[in-house]
Amino acid sequence: MRRAEVKRSAHGPADEKAQTGSPRKERCAPWSVGTADGEGDERVPSDPEKGRPQDSAPTGRKQRTSRAGSSWQHSLAAMETMYICGIGQQSYQSR
């Protein structure tokens, strides 16, 4: 029991919540929200403040850039979700 506690504290409070059981699902929610937030970055490349107006970039090209950005964030969030929601937990509890 103590060994598990030590590992839990090493990972921080996020893991503590994941350990308890039902709040585990609540812990997953903010990450899925975060991916939706990341998709909002599509507006950044076409921002006039950056000196790249919408007209200069064709629609297809702009979509591809934003999609690459969101998919990267999506995969990162998915990995963190998997770890926090207990898939990563199984690996170190079985040791």
From Swiss-Prot:
The residue ranges flagged as biased composition, category Basic and acidic residues, are 1-28, 41-53
Region Disordered: list its residue ranges.
1-73
Q: What is the top-level taxon of the source organism?
A: Viruses
* Protein name as annotated: Putative uncharacterized 10.4 kDa protein
> Native species of this protein?
Hepatitis B virus genotype D subtype ayw (isolate France/Tiollais/1979)
